[in-house]
A protein has these predicted regions:
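Residues immediately flanking
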Residues: 97-98, 234, 317-318
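Conserved beta-loop-beta/alpha segment of the NTase-like Rossmann-fold superfamily
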Residues: 165, 170-269
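A short linear-motif detector with a strong N-terminal bias
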Residues: 72-74, 91-93, 124-125, 153-156, ...
Length: 408
């Protein structure tokens, strides 16, 4: 894209401020900015005008989970089916690792955070160790696709190489970058994060399959006959990945997607909850739960909305192609966005000052006809690291790792 073409595009969307410092840039910086303007989807910006209409929930009803007693009763069947699928090369894993460790006080990717006390033990290492348990059990390596972001890709790839992929076979590890979306002020004007660069942020965890596809990695799925993808987040160091019992249960129950869930610690715990929305699987966020929903009971007398999601899903690949063809709902989120002001100074705001645009995994699930909420034991599979201290922190994760026999 040349300068005139960039001016035309920016003029069409009222974003001429992007070129405010163009004349001050080096030739390389100018080319980089023009390329960024070319690649950026600016159609999404119009969504700000319809923000209140964007994501409206339909009728919410409970969705029963497969609970621990049912899993135990069918354990052998589920496990055999899952092991068979893994041995046949039908299972891959997607690690969502685009985030930075900012809230943990680190400038590195979150997965590089050291949770060890007496030795170095990185979040990435914990996850690879968990996946290696299944590799050893099934004597089969599983293709692992690691989604990074523009901001952390190079350092993430280098970190894996420096650590010899934590003992995993490198030919089974594939890196790809998450697509980015522009970040704007409250009037929909895109911020500059540098004089020659628009402010951007990752486009939400619902963009992972489109990003995988754009990176050409769906070819790896086809070439290897991968039919199921276990999608999981970087910040839960205890989660079981490519868990044969979970895979087997989803297959045996003929569900399009499986979702690992934990029993909520309290009715108002800040976790999304599996449900049905207009008869199709969905997730209702904790802040959307009404008192009536929190008090509702199922036929056993247990809370009807009792199982929280832990961002560990199993998707059938054939369904993902269908989902990609549809426009997932757009979520507009208020965030603190560092920006270059009119005087050329970098401002780091103390409170939210604009919007980021995201699509979410929960909207992918809602496009499917069936979902299996699969209960796991919280203390064995849920140790999220969101904060440096307090709830869901490095401290609490360390305690849970120790309880599960992990040397730290």
């Amino acid at each position: 894209m040349n300068l005139e073409e960039a001016k035309l595009k920016l003029s069409k969307y009222g974003q001429e401020q992007i070129l405010r410092y163009y004349d001050e840039l080096s030739d390389d910086e100018k080319n980089a900015l023009l390329e960024q303007v070319d690649k950026t989807d600016m159609e999404v910006l119009s969504a700000i005008e319809h923000k209140s209409e964007l994501v409206k929930k339909g009728e919410i009803t409970p969705l029963d989970a497969m609970e621990l007693d049912e899993i135990k009763a069918n354990y052998d069947t589920f496990k055999n089916t899952g092991v068979e699928a893994i041995k046949a090369g039908k299972v891959g894993a997607i690690l969502l690792a685009g985030g930075m460790g900012t809230r943990l006080g680190s400038d590195n990717p979150k997965g590089m955070y050291n949770v060890g006390i007496n030795k170095e033990l990185y979040i990435f290492e914990c996850l690879i160790n968990n996946l290696m348990d299944v590799v050893k059990e099934t004597e089969t390596y599983i293709h692992l696709f690691v989604m990074t972001s523009e901001k952390n890709n190079d350092v993430t790839v280098s970190f894996f190489k420096e650590n010899n992929f934590f003992g995993y076979k490198s030919e089974y590890v594939h890196f790809f970058k998450q697509e980015m979306a522009a970040a704007t002020d409250y009037d929909g004007k895109i911020y500059l994060e540098e004089k020659g660069r628009m402010a951007t942020s990752p486009n939400g965890n619902g963009g992972w399959y489109i990003s995988l596809k754009k990176a050409g990695l769906t070819q790896v799925l086809e070439n290897n006959g991968i039919e199921w993808l276990n999608v999981f987040a970087v910040d839960n160091v205890l989660q079981r990945i490519a868990d044969p019992v979970f895979i087997g249960a989803t297959i045996e129950k003929h569900c399009a997607v499986g979702s690992k869930v934990v029993r909520k610690a309290a009715p108002d715990e800040k976790v999304g909850v599996m449900c049905l929305e207009d008869g199709k699987p969905s997730i209702v966020e904790y802040y959307e739960l009404t008192k009536e929903m929190m008090d509702a009971k199922n036929s056993k007398g247990d809370p009807a909305y009792n199982f929280g999601v832990i961002l560990n899903y199993l998707f059938r690949v054939s369904d993902l192609e269908t989902i990609v063809g549809k426009n997932l709902p757009l979520h507009i989120v208020e965030k603190k966005i560092p920006y270059i002001d009119a005087d050329g100074n970098l401002i780091k705001p103390e409170k939210p000052n604009g919007y980021k645009f995201e699509s979410l995994v929960l909207d992918m699930i809602h496009e499917l006809d069936s979902c299996l909420p699969f209960e796991v034991v919280r203390e064995k599979e849920f140790a999220p690291i969101k904060n440096a201290t307090g709830v869901d922190s490095v401290e609490t994760a360390r305690e849970l790792l120790k309880k599960n026999g992990v040397a730290i």
